[in-house]
Amino acid sequence: MEIVYDRGGLIPVVVQDAQSQAVLMLAYMNRAALQLTLQTGEAHFWSRSRQQLWHKGATSGNTQQVVDLQLDCDGDALLMRVNPAGPACHTGRTSCFHNPIDPIDWQGENHDPR
């Protein structure tokens, strides 16, 4: 199956802990990041804010050793299972997903929960 990148040349990557199955983060890869990930066995992404390649954990030491990569049924998203060497989130939390949304307080798609 062929990888389908978006107009900006990116593909979303859901990163999951291979042991606990917890979803750790959502990031994006371009072709170069995917190539580096496959070559090194460690997670590399494209930073949309900095507009540069990003080796996860290069400065913090919280690298992610890749166990496997799976392409979704449409070819436009990746699941990357990893063995993390530390927290995935820049806040120091294990996962970037730690902000629950209360459905009772949700007012619709234009509601800003801040």
Where are the regions a protein language model picked out?
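C-terminal binding/interaction regions
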Residues: 2-10, 16-24, 29-114
